[in-house]
UniProtKB/Swiss-Prot annotation:
Gene Ontology biological process terms from the UniProt entry: DNA replication initiation; regulation of DNA replication
UniProt record similarity statement: Belongs to the DnaA family.
The protein's name in its UniProt record: Chromosomal replication initiator protein DnaA
Organism: Shigella dysenteriae serotype 1 (strain Sd197)
Keyword list, A-Z: ATP-binding, Cytoplasm, DNA replication, DNA-binding, Lipid-binding, Nucleotide-binding
InterPro entries registered for this protein in UniProt: AAA+_ATPase, Chromosome_initiator_DnaA, Chromosome_initiator_DnaA-like, Chromosome_initiator_DnaA_CS, DnaA_C, DnaA_dom, DnaA_N_dom, DnaA_N_sf
Cellular compartments annotated: Cytoplasm
Main location as per UniProt: cytoplasm
CDD domains: AAA, Bac_DnaA_C
Region (Domain II): 91-130
Function statement: Plays an essential role in the initiation and regulation of chromosomal replication. ATP-DnaA binds to the origin of replication (oriC) to initiate formation of the DNA replication initiation complex once per cell cycle. Binds the DnaA box (a 9 base pair repeat at the origin) and separates the double-stranded (ds)DNA. Forms a right-handed helical filament on oriC DNA; dsDNA binds to the exterior of the filament while single-stranded (ss)DNA is stabiized in the filament's interior.
Gene3D superfamilies linked to this entry: 1.10.1750.10, 1.10.8.60, 3.30.300.180, P-loop containing nucleotide triphosphate hydrolases
Lineage top rank: taxon: Bacteria
Amino acid sequence: MSLSLWQQCLARLQDELPATEFSMWIRPLQAELSDNTLALYAPNRFVLDWVRDKYLNNINGLLTSFCGADAPQLRFEVGTKPVTQTPQAAVTSNVAAPALVAQTQPQRAAPSTRSGWDNVPAPAEPTYRSNVNVKHTFDNFVEGKSNQLARAAARQVADNPGGAYNPLFLYGGTGLGKTHLLHAVGNGIMARKPNAKVVYMHSERFVQDMVKALQNNAIEEFKRYYRSVDALLIDDIQFFANKERSQEEFFHTFNALLEGNQQIILTSDRYPKEINGVEDRLKSRFGWGLTVAIEPPELETRVAILMKKADENDIRLPGEVAFFIAKRLRSNVRELEGALNRVIANANFTGRAITIDFVREALRDLLALQEKLVTIDNIQKTVAEYYKIKVADLLSKRRSRSVARPRQMAMALAKELTNHSLPEIGDAFGGRDHTTVLHACRKIEQLREESHDIKEDFSNLIRTLSS
């Protein structure tokens, strides 16, 4: 049986799975084939359980398709593949890394075999300002399809800091939970190791600290502080744009931390390569570990967020009321929580029960603004402008991909962002049947799973239409 069997499986899995999933769960696996058994070694129990639950059938199916009745048995273990004298025994991934996956860079120093916790310089260290908010944990982070991968990656980093996903780069629009996950990772690391030096900050704080260090002739103390942390969590890294001196210092800090296996987590409102005003060498390093998008929450997640928030406030929120709010406010978690706080405050002040009619009254200006902003007409104009076509093309019978794909995108957005029925949406797109609209919605949902470009287009348009 060929020792390239696992490489064949990897190649097929890379074609079949979204790039981020492949990078996060499949790429870290090591494989060893012996005695008709294929042993897969996962870096930790979390990855092992996830792969076994989610991808066991996929892998077994591939083994059967390649080997037929001679397919090897699968065995999962936590750890690394035993080292042997035979070079061919190394059955590791050589599949080319896709755009959003972890990549090995020639410039990066080989990781130390010691844990990042052991590499921290001793004595004469400054007092660390953790700034981690203890209220933001994984337990109170509402998971949904839109943020599932981001949460899973953050959870794994908290369990194994300085490991495979270093740096971890989370990106997405405002109010989607990036900061919550940063704090959750910090809390997770400190729960496992209470004396860990975990520092959370906004990128502007890093800039301010550096400026102050330069003014006070204390740049060496600044370097020692930031390069001796166990985990550095920086929010809104895009604010480094056009700050050349800060970028220079962060570049060297970044390298020092990675060489010491100390964890870095960064967030931004956009994909690393799209951050203007940041040096290419930094943007390249941002993608060395794992880059994961957080999407605007889908309807079910928005409802779950509202119900959990109400429960935290000891408020009974009827399901139909949560659905009513979630259906109308779609842009981000912060907007949802703000609306619910407003409803709760009004209910407390008036002593009235929280019903749909009460919510309509309490949020009337917000709902009116939302309905005014997002109309099918507005969606069509925005999509046409985004794809550089005419609105008339969206309404036409043309079927070329350059028109059909934007038309499907516009239909999917109309279903997501308005309260119109499928027949009403079809009528607005040149009198099309409701089944055409349904097909368009399903097609875009499928493409968002398979294509980074489509996922980005959808997120960008949602953000534009909801802002």
